Each structure stands twice: as structure tokens, then as C-alpha cells.
């Protein structure tokens, strides 16, 4: 330790006396950054200067390096000036801390501490030090610790507690010198600190790393592992240094003081039970651990580190050194001291003392258990009242009103004191003025303190109220001075008995001894821009009564600095705050769209516009990434407009939901607000600042002419036009500015939409006051107002494209409708768009608009010419007449709102009006919904909801009465019989409904008083009447349909008419057939006025019921047929009944419905053997089972061109495989490839080895998930096997597949692929399957793969017959189970033979035996392999042997040594 890079070995220079160690560390790190490195002479001169500076009366804590630089004499030897310059540049990165709370009065002794209560926890003050600065010349590669290095570091920190300034100074220099990795730092922590400190440090470091990873670290890749792992790489210097800073910062947050707490020294006795030791630790932590500190990691760490040696060995042996506490207790519960028995020591609870409790004065309990609060230690130092603490003193809570600020006073309300340090990088909740960058051009705005703007016409003087605790509060004018370390107050504010001390002060006039005194009494200062008072523990007193200065000690509690704005700007201008959310917070890659070339005229205009924007401060030069093209557009008056194409940025931006529902309805402006004024903001978007991090998304390039040089890059500083979230952001900012004005003038109204503002007031005087306040607020926030566009009554008021008159509204521009039949599509589309804009004031129904909308449909080319029919031309005439009457009334607040809803075939028209008014308030049009049926009740309910929503949103009222054109009978029938969801809505609003009745023809003259030529609205009546009971005198009509045919039967005691007919092409559907059958039936029953209709189609049944209750025809594919139903059912009385089909009931309704269904049925003919073979390519035996003779089947096979070739599945020898003893005993699985039409299919095949039944599925991959899916489908098809046998492919040996087999209790084994002995069955099955697939695709090349595979499985499993048992695979798979043959049954008397044998599964070449077979069967023999067990041996491992002759007996010449194979 003590070694510095590029320097000889020398001890670390010691700090001068009186300077804190962490401040000295800052000076050392700044000195080590000098190039070349510092010398001993530099350190000597630095210590000499600091010693002189520490002796000055003005203390430098918190230290101010700028003040030190000002005290440095010119020509001072050494490089002290360079060191201070480095510190001044680095100090801006460290946030200052608030002043400590005022200490209690020293005149009173602290209360006696209670021995039963642990001392309170005091959190150490974190040292204020600069970040680790790696000096120049540091080695590029990291050097790991050596043991001598660790010993040297430990020797220097042996007398310092972890987190103390001396400890942090040594550790920081060690980190600076060795540049350690994360593992090196962990080794250093374990070597230096106890396990408790290491555990707490590890926990704090984890939380810091989590915050840093969330915030984002340069060079950190989340996919490469956690930060600890990446910081271990010596090549990752950036990440390593980030980890070093976090590791050092974790020491500053360690709980506890410099000494170890009392509970850290609790050790387990040599004979103490482990559970008693843990209990003592738990109680000590509960009493002494600071609040908020987690107890569990500390308890686990101490439970191991402070245990005795024997318990530590037990915990190490079981691996429970840092396990949960329960595991540690179980590991040590059986431990007892050597040569001693287990003793349970029970300590009795100590009785409470006889003395009374000092809190409540009562005896019988401990003071720590008392519920009363702790009494104050003595009289309050502020008011000398002994009944409360100083923190509860009423003098700290001002009761007198605060002084009113003057017009030019400060406007900011700084935050109050808080017990924890604030993060000043965010400005303490304040907003900086726009000229802050001009005042401090070299500072980063994120690191500047909040500012206090002052009046440039006056000195920085403010009014303050001072309370010296010895006299009444007084108001004085004080000078704000950031150069004064302490606040100075005149002696006139203090009483004569105030204790004052002599002091010397060094100021601008030199040093003085008797001018100022020092007082230690707390002083309360109330400032106009602060809601809570400032408490100063001491201040200077001017004995000559000349000065009142607010110094840095007071301003530091305000967390602000002074700022004097330029003389050009008003003194109280505050900018609009930058938006908190822009829609680009996810920071995608900025767009890089190349700038397209411009002609010389446009390029010159663009350069002129850019120069004007640069002078206005809207843009600035830029060199970063991102680009969007720009171009100028020439306006009608000859000037140019700057256009920035931000479509690429808009595509990356998240839409912000706007709180504005749209432009306000000006008809809601009451007639009582007759005095109006408009305010138009100029370049409103250019007043919202744009954060720096979003500039790449709004950058552009101005090219040079003919590409003579690189273009000039710029980026927006403010919110540009063309950004899709700009209107929403500006609306939110403007609404925030206008909200105080709205609250100050409740009798007036302010309408705001985008950058247009309308002021409405009941009197001219109120309008002037409202206008003045609004203008002042807008100007104070930097929003320029266009004076030439301001309008005021009396006079014409044009706002949002409308002209506001005293009692009505008109549109500024009403379109002119030319009457002609030929239109270009863009012309008609533009005309209808203009008509739609003024439709709220146009007295017309929906029909003329719908007629012209239909003319725009079915056109795909924008250049098409549209030819209108006579009815559409007539619609143009009606619209021109209606536009001539375009006018709307303004709201009369004394009259109720009325509504009229007219339902027509083309849509709904809703009118909101007031009685006795010449014009309505608004006309609303809505098209029919996109459904096949539009019930009148549903349309009425939707119109009512739309009407209520609009009137509440625009007028704040509901319509008192709603007129509609549905007849009363139809309306009541819909309410009583319909189950539509709109019925509850209509019932809820039924008290407001009123039927127009006979007044429909006179609607316009009776209610609206309009002269517009509008057609009368007819009352709506249903097409036919629905009878609730069956009609005895009417015939019965049955109809039905299928996808290909339709039929009906007309019956009246006998079948009068019946017919079945096919559907006409090209569209064929069951609904179309059912509708067509009903239409033919109605056509045949046209002569009857009454009719009973029986339908088994729910679609037609509900359609007819809705038609009977009243409906309009909507959009449907069956619209031409549905339009015929009203004509055929007109004025009929119909009984409608739904029939359930295929019930086979004996009643006549079911019988006639079944007879109708029979007319649709086409008989199904069985396939002939030749057709069956052409479809499936099944075998000869399958054809004979389907009725063909053997000769016919043979001829069919010979005539099939696909079956004449050889089958590839027979090319593999049959071999011998292990087969199952019953179905679903053993399966074999494999994946085979089948390529067709450039698509490679993976066929997952499973074969039952007993029956040969196959299950196959086609997949596109060979993954484990596909293999699992195919096995599950096979189990659903064939059943669950006991064993499965596959090859060792990756899909079958994966962990997922094995886990699935284990969960299903299936045993999985593997075999050698392409081996006739082990995998022959599944390989042959693959060949059979692919042969059939090739045949199918040869016959039908377009056959889907799923269909071909299904036909092949049907053919193999259900049609083809096995030659050995004359059954199909499916029959064999589902055949009855045979009784198992036990191996222990009595042996037969059949003659057995002697065999040599080899045991299965062994590779031995030596034959064993001979042994006499106990039993022989097909394929194996039961051989006694030992004295106590026998085993079935297959024939391939047996060799026939002669019977051994008895001892001494002759050999039998007939016996031969034979070898058998199965």
C-alpha cells in the first residue's frame, strides 16, 4: 500500500491538521491526475497553503474550491493552482447536502440513559468525496492482489471502522492503484472485514447493482450475464470501473457507527446450547438493530461466525454456513459439550423495579414497556416551555400570515426542509428560466441548482421576516449575497440581554475584530418564496446596525442560487416546462432518411428559413445521428413555409392519449355571455422545449448547392410542427397555464382548442379584466400573442371556422353545390367532405347524403369519372337548398333541451333544439350499422345514447323530451315481446319518449320553425303481424335447405304443393338454401292472408321474428333474397313456430318436417371394388372382403399402373425383433422423411409390435416438442403403451421427452437405427406408408398431405389383411386378450433336449452348458441358468447338444451335436 503509478515507492502524504480525511483524498486524486505526476515539492506547497486557509475565520466546510482558488496568491509556488482547477471542474458532479438540523441547546444536560434500553442508533454521515479518478499512466492491464498487498492494506485500516473517512481513503487509493476486478474486490472484503460487515456490504451492493442495471450502464450487455460476471473480465475496463464505484458506494450505506454494535460481540459459550445462543442473538438484534435494516442476513451471519468451534465444524460438515436458520438449528440440536449431558437452562424473567416509571410516574412495569411518550429532557430552548420537545415548539410553526409579495417579488416557492438530502440534479422541483444556458454556458443543465430570479432594476434585495426568539418578529430588507458564508443581521433585531461572542471576520474590506459579534441562539427567517421558515443555529450580528445579509448558510437550506435575467426580458418570465412524456421514451434507433435534392430557388428559400429559425433559437447546430428530410413550400401570398418530414419519427412514436374530445360545440355558448374576444397564439409549438436526448429524432440536413460540400446539420430545440404528439403536448401545457385564470373568473368562460382561445364574459368590464389576466399569464410563460388576429365584440367574431352572432352561429365558408351528373371522383369526394364539415347546421335528412355516398362506392381508381343517376342529381338539389338555410341557434339557458329522432331506410337523423327558437342547436347523422338486420328498437336506443352523450358533453344537460317516429303499437310490442339487449335502455328512457303521431308531416313547422323544404317523416309500422297462437283456418308451410338443395311443403289437411330444387351457382350455402325454400313456399301461398310457418332453421326463425317487430334491411350476402320477404309477407297475419329436426316423434309437425328433410336427401351408393382400389390402393385380400372374387381382385391389381411396380418395403430382410406379447405392450417409433413438391415432411411413425397398427403424423420439424405431440396423438389413437423403443435421435433422448415418458409411466429404450434385428418393423412400416403416399400423389398431385396420410392409415390399419392371421391390423389390435402363460406351471411330459447356451445381453463367445431345457416354445427355450433360477433363451443363442452319458456308460451313436437358429 502507498505505491503510486509512475512514481517511486513513497508513503501516502498525510493530511494537514484540521482537514478532514475525505477532503484530503480529493486533493490527492486531483494531484495524481497531473501530467507529469506530482512531486514531493507540490505536496509540500499544497499542505502549506491548506494550513494557511484553515486558519481563516470563514470556514470552508462544506468546502468550496472556487473560494480556495480566489484566496491563492498570484505566483504561488508549486502546482497548487492546477490542482484546484481540476477540483473546480469535478465539483459540479457531486450534489451538495442540506444543512443539518439545529442542535438542541447546550445549556441542558442530556437525560440519564436507561440501562435496559439499548442506545439509539446513529447513522454515520456519508463522506463527501469525489469519484475515483484513475491517474494518467495507469497500467492498461489489471494486476491481482498479492498477499503482501492485502497485509499492507489491512495494516493501514486496522484502526479505522468500515465506512470511516480514513478507511475509505485507503481503500479508494488501493482501488486506484491496482484497478481490481469484481473477484479481487470480494477477496479484499473478506480479508479486511468481519462476516457481518461483509454480509451487510453484499446486501447493499446487490441493491445498488440492481438500480444501476435498471438505469442502464455503458457497455453492459444483459445477455452476457450479471454485472459481477462481466466486471471480472480484465478487458472490460469501463464496466470494471463502474463496479468499483458501486462497491465503494456500498460502504457509505452500511448501518451502525464506527464501533461494532453491542450485538456483534455476542459469542457462544463453550458449554452453551446452540439454540440458547441464537435466542440471545435474536433478542439483541430486536433491541439494537436500526429500523428498516433486514435482520435475517445479520442473524444468519452471526449464528455461524460467533458460534464456538465445535458448532462451526458441525455447520461446515453439513454445508450450512449460510443456510436458513432452521437448517442451522437442526444441524446443531444434538450437540452437547464433551463429557457433559444436555442441560436446559431456563432463565427466569427479571421482575420490574419498584421505582416508578420516568415516563408515566407509575410503578409495576419497565420503562421500555410504557405506552406513554418519552417526556422532554428539559425546557424547550426556543420558548423555555418544559412540556414539549423542541421539534414540537409552536414557534417553528408560524401562526401569523406570511407577508404579501409585491408585484416584482420572487415567484418561486422553493421546497421545504427535508430530513434526507435532496437530489439536486433534478432541480428540487423548480423550473429554470430560458436564459440559464446563456448565464452559465459551460454547465450541464442537469447539474445546475434551482434558480431564484431577481428584479434587474433593483439590487438583489428581498423582504424577510426575522424572529430572534428574544423579541417580536420584524420585517426587514436583506441583501442576498452568495459570497457571504454566514448570515448577518443588525443588532437592532436582538434584545439587550442576547448573549454575543467576539469574533474576527475576513471580508472585502479586510479583517475586522470588533464590527461583528457571534450569537448561538437559533434564528428563524421567513422568506417570501418559501412556505416554511429557515432555522439558523448561529449568525453574525452587525454592531453598527448597517448590514442585513442573507448568506450561503440560509441559501443552502433553500437549495437555490441567485440569477439576474437580462434586461431584454421581463423580470418574471418563466418558460413552459419540458414535457415529461414525449412518446419516444423507449429510445428506438433514430431514423436515417437521406435528404433529397432541391432546385436553387427552393434551396435558397430553405437556407433563409433555417437562418430565421436559428436566430429565433428554435434550432441549433447538431452533429449527432438521425436525419429527416426538409423542404420549403410556397404559400399563396408568395412567402415560403418550412416543412420537416417527420413521418419516420412518427412511426416510431407511441401515441399519447389526448384529454381533449375535439373542438368544442360553439352552440353551447350561452346567449348571456354576449361579450367575446379571441386570442391567437403565434408559433405556439415553438415555445415548448425539447429535451436533449430526443434531438436525434428531429435532426435535418441543409444541403449545399450542387453538392459542393457537406451539408449543414441542425436539430430542433423546441417541439416542431409535424410531430404527431405536438398538438397533445401543447394542449396539456396551455390548459395548465389557463387553469388558474378559469378559477379566478368563475362567471366567465374560456374556450381552448389547440392554439385558439375564446374568452366569453357577461359584461364588458369582466371581459377586460379576463383579457388582461389571460394576456399577462400567456406572456409571462413566453407564449407570443398575435395582436393583429385578436377579435372583440362589438363586431364579427370568427372562431374555429364559424361566425358567432348574438343569438345564432353560421359557418364561415358554406360550400357551393353545382348541379351536374358527371363528376370526377376527387371533386365529389371533396364536396362531400365540405358538406360533412357543415352538416351540424344543415337542415337535411340522411337520405340525400346516403345517396351521394353510394355513388363513391365500388371505385378503385382515383381517376374514375362518376355519372350520377337522376335520384342522385335530385339529392344535389336538396343539399343546395338545405345549405342555403345553414344556421344554428345559441343555447338559451332558461329553456329545456328537446330532441327529435327520425329513423329512415338510409340512417338516423337526430335534431337537438329548443322550443320557440328559429333554428335548432345541432343536426346529427348516423348510418345504419353493418349488420344483416337493424331493428328499430336497437336504432332508437343507439340514437338515444348518442344524443345523451352529445348533449352532456357539449351542453351539460339532457333532453327533457325525445320525439321519435316509431308507432306506439310497434314500440309497445317490441318492449313486451323482444329479448333484444336494447329493451332495458328503452325502458329506462321511456318517460322521456313522445311519439310524433299525426304531426310527422308537420314536424319541421311545428317544432323547428324552419323554412327548409324537408320531406315529411312517416311513422314506422311493421310489414306483417305476428299471431301469438296457431291459426286454424290457415295452411301450414314447411321449408328447409342444405348446402346444395332447397325444399318446401305447403299442407292443408293434405299436401297442396311440394318442391325440391338445386341451388343456382356459384354461391352455395345452407342459409341461402333455407331462405330460397321459404321464398318459394311463400310465393305458392300468396293467395292466403293468414299462414302458419314451421321452420327448423333458427336463423330464419329469428330473422322473421325481428322483421315482425320492425327492422331495416342491412348489409348481407343474402340481401337480394331478403329484400323479397317484405313483399311476400306484406299485410299478412303469420304464426311462426320453430321445430327441432330429427326428433322422430309421432306428431304431425315432426312427420311433415321429416318429410321436408327427405326431399333434400340424396342416396349414398357403396363403392365398387375397383373404385375402392383406385381411392386407397388396398391389397388383394382387402378387395375380396369388399365383394370381389380372387380373379377380379388380381385383375384390378394388375391393371393399376401404380401397383405394378415393386414395393420398396420388401427390400429389407425381416430379421428378428423383440415383439410385444399383447397390444400396447411394446411400440417402435421413428421419424422418416418424405419430400413432395419441394416440401420436406417429417413423418413421425409409431408401430405396435404385436398387431402392427400404425399411427403417423406429419410435422415440419424434428424437435422434442414435435416428438411429444406425435406420441400423444398416437396414444389417443391406439392407447397407452408400456414400453416404447426408438433410435437415439436428439428428439427422443431430450430431457423433455424423457420427462414426458416418466410422467406417463412409459419405459423408453433405444435401438440401433436401420438395423433389421432391432428396428426392422418400424422401417418396413415406413416403407409401406411412403409407398402408398407416392401412389396417392401420382393419382392426385393436388391432394393435401393431411388427406393423403389419413387415407394411407385407413388403408393400412382397416383394409389390408395380414397373411399370417387373416385379420386387419385394427382387428388384431382390438382382439380379446389371451390369458398369460405362467412360467411356474407344471411342466409337460413332452420330451425335451439338451442345449449349449449364451446369456442374452452378454458379449461372451464361450458357450455354457449343456443344460436340459425345462420347456420349449416357439422362438425360445426355458433353460436353468443356475441352481435356483431359469431363463428363457432365444433360439439364436442356443446350440443343440447330445445328452451327456452317465458316468462310465456308452455313447449313443444317434445323438449329434446340432446348432439351431430361429
UniProtKB/Swiss-Prot annotation:
Residues 1393-1443 bind DNA. The record marks 130-131, 344-345, 449-450, 574-575, 582-583, 1021-1022, 1167-1168 as: Cleavage. One of its GO terms (cellular component) is viral nucleocapsid. The gene is gag-pro-pol. Mg(2+) 1 binds at residues 680, 755-756. A motif (PPXY motif) lies at residues 118-121. The active site is at residue 481. Its cofactor is Mg(2+). One of its GO terms (molecular function) is structural molecule activity. This is Gag-Pro-Pol polyprotein. Changing residue 486 to I: Almost no effect on protease activity. GO terms for biological process: DNA integration; DNA recombination; establishment of integrated proviral latency; proteolysis; symbiont entry into host cell; symbiont-mediated suppression of host gene expression; viral genome integration into host DNA; viral translational frameshifting. A motif (PTAP/PSAP motif) lies at residues 124-127. Residues 93-144 are annotated as: Disordered. Residues 614-804 form the Reverse transcriptase domain. The RT polymerase active site binds 2 magnesium ions. Changing residue 516 to Q: Complete loss of protease activity. Residues 1219-1388 form the Integrase catalytic domain. Mg(2+) 3 binds at residues 1230, 1287.
Amino acid at each position: 500500500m502507498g505505491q503510486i503509478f509512475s512514481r517511486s515507492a513513497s508513503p501516502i502524504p498525510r493530511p494537514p491538521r484540521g482537514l478532514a480525511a475525505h477532503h484530503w483524498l480529493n486533493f490527492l486524486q486531483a494531484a495524481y491526475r497531473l501530467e507529469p505526476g506530482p512531486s514531493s515539492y507540490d505536496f509540500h506547497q499544497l499542505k502549506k497553503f491548506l494550513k494557511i486557509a484553515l486558519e481563516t475565520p470563514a470556514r470552508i466546510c462544506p468546502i468550496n474550491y472556487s473560494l480556495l482558488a480566489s484566496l491563492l496568491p498570484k505566483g504561488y509556488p508549486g502546482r497548487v493552482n492546477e490542482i484546484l482547477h481540476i477540483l473546480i471542474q469535478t465539483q459540479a458532479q457531486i450534489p451538495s447536502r442540506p444543512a443539518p438540523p439545529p442542535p438542541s441547546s447546550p445549556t441542558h444536560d442530556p437525560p440519564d440513559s436507561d440501562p435496559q434500553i439499548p442506545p439509539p442508533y446513529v447513522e454515520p454521515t456519508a463522506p463527501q468525496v469525489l469519484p475515483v479518478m484513475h491517474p494518467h499512466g495507469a497500467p492498461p492491464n489489471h494486476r491481482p492482489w498479492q498477499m503482501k498487498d492485502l497485509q499492507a492494506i489491512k495494516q493501514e485500516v486496522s484502526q479505522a471502522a468500515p465506512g470511516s473517512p480514513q478507511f475509505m481513503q485507503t481503500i479508494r487509493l488501493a482501488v486506484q492503484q491496482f484497478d481490481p476486478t469484481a473477484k479481487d474486490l470480494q477477496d479484499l472484503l473478506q480479508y479486511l472485514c468481519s462476516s457481518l460487515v461483509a454480509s451487510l456490504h453484499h446486501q447493499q451492493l446487490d441493491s445498488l447493482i440492481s438500480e444501476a442495471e435498471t438505469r442502464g450502464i455503458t457497455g453492459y450487455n444483459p445477455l452476457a450475464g450479471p454485472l459481477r460476471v462481466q466486471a471480472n473480465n480484465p478487458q472490460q475496463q469501463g464496466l470494471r470501473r463502474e463496479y468499483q464505484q458501486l462497491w465503494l458506494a456500498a460502504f457509505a450505506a452500511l448501518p451502525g457507527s464506527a464501533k461494532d454494535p453491542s450485538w456483534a460481540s455476542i459469542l457462544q459459550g463453550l458449554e452453551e446450547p446452540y439454540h440458547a445462543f441464537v435466542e440471545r442473538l435474536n433478542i439483541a438484534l430486536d433491541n439494537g438493530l436500526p429500523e428498516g435494516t433486514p435482520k435475517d442476513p445479520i442473524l444468519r451471519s452471526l449464528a455461524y461466525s460467533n458460534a464456538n468451534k465445535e458448532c462451526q465444524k458441525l455447520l461446515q460438515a453439513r454445508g450450512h454456513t449460510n443456510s436458513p436458520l432452521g437448517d442451522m438449528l437442526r444441524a446443531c440440536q444434538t450437540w452437547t459439550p464433551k463429557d457433559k449431558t444436555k442441560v436446559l437452562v431456563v432463565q427466569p424473567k427479571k421482575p420490574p423495579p419498584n421505582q416508578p416509571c420516568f415516563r408515566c410516574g407509575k410503578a409495576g412495569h419497565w420503562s421500555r414497556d410504557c405506552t406513554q411518550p418519552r417526556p422532554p429532557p428539559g425546557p424547550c430552548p426556543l420558548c423555555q416551555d418544559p412540556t414539549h420537545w423542541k421539534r414540537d415548539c409552536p414557534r417553528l410553526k408560524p401562526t401569523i400570515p406570511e407577508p404579501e409579495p409585491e408585484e416584482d417579488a420572487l415567484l418561486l416557492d422553493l421546497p421545504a426542509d427535508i430530513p434526507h438530502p435532496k437530489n439536486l440534479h433534478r432541480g428540487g422541483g423548480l423550473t429554470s428560466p430560458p436564459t440559464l444556458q446563456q448565464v452559465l454556458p459551460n454547465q450541464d443543465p442537469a447539474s445546475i441548482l434551482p434558480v431564484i430570479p431577481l428584479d434587474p432594476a433593483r439590487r438583489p434585495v428581498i423582504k424577510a421576516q426575522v424572529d430572534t426568539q428574544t423579541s417580536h418578529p420584524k420585517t426587514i430588507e436583506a441583501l442576498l449575497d452568495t459570497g457571504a458564508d454566514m448570515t448577518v443581521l443588525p443588532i437592532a433585531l436582538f434584545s439587550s440581554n442576547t448573549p454575543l461572542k467576539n469574533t474576527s471576520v475576513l471580508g472585502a474590506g479586510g479583517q475586522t475584530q470588533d464590527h461583528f459579534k457571534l450569537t448561538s441562539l437559533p434564528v428563524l427567517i421567513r422568506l417570501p418564496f418559501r412556505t416554511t421558515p429557515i432555522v439558523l443555529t448561529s449568525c453574525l450580528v452587525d454592531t453598527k446596525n448597517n448590514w442585513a445579509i442573507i448568506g450561503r448558510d440560509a441559501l443552502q437550506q433553500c437549495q437555490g442560487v441567485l440569477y439576474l435575467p437580462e434586461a431584454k426580458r421581463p423580470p418574471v418570465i418563466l418558460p413552459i416546462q419540458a414535457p415529461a412524456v414525449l412518446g419516444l421514451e423507449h429510445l428506438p434507433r433514430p431514423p436515417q432518411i437521406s435528404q433529397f435534392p432541391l432546385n436553387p430557388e427552393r434551396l435558397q428559400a430553405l437556407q433563409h428559413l433555417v437562418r430565421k429559425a436559428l436566430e429565433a433559437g428554435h434550432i441549433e447546430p447538431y452533429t449527432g445521428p438521425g436525419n429527416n428530410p426538409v423542404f420549403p413550400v410556397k404559400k399563396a401570398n408568395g412567402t415560403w413555409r418550412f416543412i420537416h418530414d417527420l413521418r419516420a419519427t412518427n412511426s416510431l412514436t407511441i401515441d399519447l392519449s389526448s384529454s381533449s374530445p375535439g373542438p368544442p360545440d360553439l352552440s353551447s355558448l350561452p346567449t348571456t355571455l354576449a361579450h367575446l374576444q379571441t386570442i391567437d397564439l403565434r408559433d405556439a409549438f415553438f415555445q415548448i422545449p425539447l429535451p436533449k436526448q430526443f434531438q436525434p429524432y428531429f435532426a435535418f440536413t441543409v444541403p449545399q448547392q450542387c453538392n459542393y460540400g457537406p451539408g449543414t446539420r441542425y436539430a430542433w430545440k423546441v417541439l416542431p410542427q409535424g410531430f404527431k404528439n405536438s398538438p397533445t403536448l401543447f394542449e396539456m401545457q396551455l390548459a395548465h397555464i389557463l387553469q388558474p385564470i378559469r378559477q379566478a373568473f368563475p362567471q366567465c368562460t374560456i374556450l381552448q382548442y389547440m392554439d385558439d382561445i375564446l374568452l366569453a364574459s357577461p359584461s364588458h368590464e369582466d371581459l377586460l379584466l379576463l383579457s388582461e389576466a389571460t394576456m399577462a399569464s400567456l406572456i409571462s410563460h413566453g407564449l407570443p400573442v398575435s395582436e393583429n388576429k385578436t377579435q372583440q365584440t362589438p363586431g364579427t367574431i370568427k372562431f374555429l371556422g364559424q361566425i358567432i352572432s348574438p343569438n345564432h352561429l353560421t359557418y364561415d365558408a358554406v360550400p357551393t353545390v353545382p348541379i351536374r351528373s358527371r363528376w370526377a371522383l376527387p371533386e365529389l369526394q371533396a364536396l362531400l367532405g365540405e358538406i360533412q364539415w357543415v352538416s351540424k347546421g344543415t337542415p337535411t335528412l340522411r337520405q340525400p347524403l346516403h345517396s351521394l355516398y353510394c355513388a363513391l362506392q365500388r371505385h378503385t381508381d382515383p381517376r374514375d369519372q362518376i355519372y350520377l343517376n337522376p335520384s342522385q342529381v335530385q339529392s344535389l338539389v336538396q343539399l343546395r337548398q338545405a345549405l342555403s338555410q345553414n344556421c344554428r341557434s345559441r343555447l338559451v339557458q332558461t329553456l329545456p333541451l328537446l330532441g327529435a329522432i327520425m329513423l329512415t331506410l338510409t340512417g338516423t337523423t337526430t335534431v337537438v333544439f329548443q322550443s320557440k327558437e328559429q333554428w335548432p342547436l345541432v343536426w346529427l347523422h348516423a348510418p345504419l350499422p353493418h349488420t344483416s338486420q337493424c331493428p328499430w328498437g336497437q336504432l332508437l336506443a343507439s340514437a338515444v345514447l348518442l344524443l345523451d352523450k352529445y348533449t352532456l358533453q357539449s351542453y351539460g344537460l339532457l333532453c327533457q323530451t325525445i320525439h321519435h317516429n316509431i308507432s306506439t303499437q310497434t314500440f309497445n310490442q317490441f318492449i313486451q315481446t323482444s329479448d333484444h339487449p336494447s329493451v332495458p335502455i328503452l325502458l329506462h328512457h321511456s318517460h322521456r319518449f313522445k311519439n310524433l303521431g299525426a304531426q310527422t308531416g308537420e314536424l319541421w313547422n311545428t317544432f323547428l320553425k324552419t323554412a327548409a323544404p324537408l320531406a315529411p317523416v312517416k311513422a314506422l309500422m311493421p310489414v306483417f303481424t305476428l299471431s301469438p297462437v296457431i291459426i286454424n283456418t290457415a295452411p301450414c308451410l314447411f321449408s328447409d335447405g342444405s348446402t346444395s338443395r332447397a325444399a318446401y311443403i305447403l299442407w292443408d289437411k293434405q299436401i297442396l304443393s311440394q318442391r325440391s330444387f338445386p341451388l343456382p351457382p356459384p354461391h352455395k350455402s345452407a342459409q341461402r338454401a333455407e331462405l330460397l325454400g321459404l321464398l318459394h313456399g311463400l310465393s305458392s301461398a300468396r293467395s292466403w292472408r293468414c299462414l302458419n310457418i314451421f321452420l327448423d332453421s333458427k336463423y330464419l326463425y329469428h330473422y322473421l321474428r325481428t322483421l315482425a317487430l320492425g327492422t331495416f334491411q342491412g348489409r348481407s350476402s343474402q340481401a337480394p333474397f331478403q329484400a323479397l320477404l317484405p313483399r311476400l309477407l306484406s299485410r299478412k297475419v303469420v304464426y311462426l313456430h320453430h321445430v327441432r329436426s330429427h326428433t322422430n316423434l309421432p306428431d304431425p309437425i315432426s312427420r311433415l318436417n321429416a318429410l321436408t328433410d327427405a326431399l333434400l336427401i340424396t342416396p349414398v351408393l357403396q363403392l365398387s371394388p375397383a373404385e375402392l382400389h383406385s381411392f386407397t390402393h388396398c391389397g388383394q385380400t382387402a378387395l375380396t372382403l369388399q365383394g370381389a372374387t380372387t380373379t377380379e381382385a388380381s385383375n384390378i391389381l394388375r391393371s393399376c399402373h401404380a401397383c405394378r411396380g415393386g414395393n420398396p418395403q420388401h427390400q429389407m430382410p425381416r430379421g428378428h425383433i423383440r415383439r410385444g406379447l399383447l397390444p400396447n405392450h411394446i411400440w417402435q417409433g421413428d421419424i422418416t422423411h418424405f419430400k413432395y413438391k419441394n416440401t420436406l415432411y417429417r413423418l413421425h411413425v409409431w408401430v405396435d409390435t404385436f398387431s402392427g397398427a400404425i399411427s403417423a403424423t406429419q410435422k415440419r420439424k424434428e424437435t422434442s416438442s414435435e416428438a411429444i405431440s406425435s406420441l400423444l396423438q398416437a396414444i389417443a389413437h391406439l392407447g397407452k403403451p408400456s414400453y416404447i423403443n426408438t433410435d437415439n435421435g436428439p428428439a427422443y433422448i431430450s430431457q423433455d421427452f424423457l420427462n414426458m415418458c416418466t410422467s406417463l409411466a412409459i419405459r423408453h429404450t433405444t435401438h440401433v437405427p436401420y438395423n433389421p434385428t432391432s428396428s426392422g418393423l418400424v422401417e418396413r412400416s415406413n416403407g409401406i406408408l411412403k409407398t402408398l403416399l407416392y401412389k396417392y400423389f401420382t393419382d392426385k398431385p393436388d391432394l393435401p398431405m393431411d388427406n393423403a396420410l389419413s387415407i394411407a392409415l385407413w388403408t393400412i390399419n382397416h383394409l389390408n389383411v395380414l397373411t399370417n392371421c387373416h385379420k386387419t391390423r385394427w382387428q388384431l389390435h382390438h382382439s380379446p386378450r389371451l390369458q398369460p402363460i405362467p412360467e411356474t406351471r407344471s411342466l409337460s411330459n413332452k420330451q425335451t433336449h439338451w442345449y449349449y447356451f449364451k446369456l442374452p445381453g452378454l458379449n461372451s463367445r464361450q458357450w455354457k452348458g449343456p443344460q436340459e431345457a425345462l420347456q420349449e416354445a416357439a422362438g425360445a427355450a426355458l433353460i436353468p441358468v443356475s441352481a435356483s433360477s431359469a431363463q428363457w433363451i432365444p433360439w439364436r443363442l442356443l446350440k443343440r447338444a447330445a445328452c451327456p452319458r452317465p458316468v462310465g456308460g456308452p455313447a449313443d451313436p444317434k445323438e449329434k451335436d446340432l446348432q439351431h437358429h430361429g
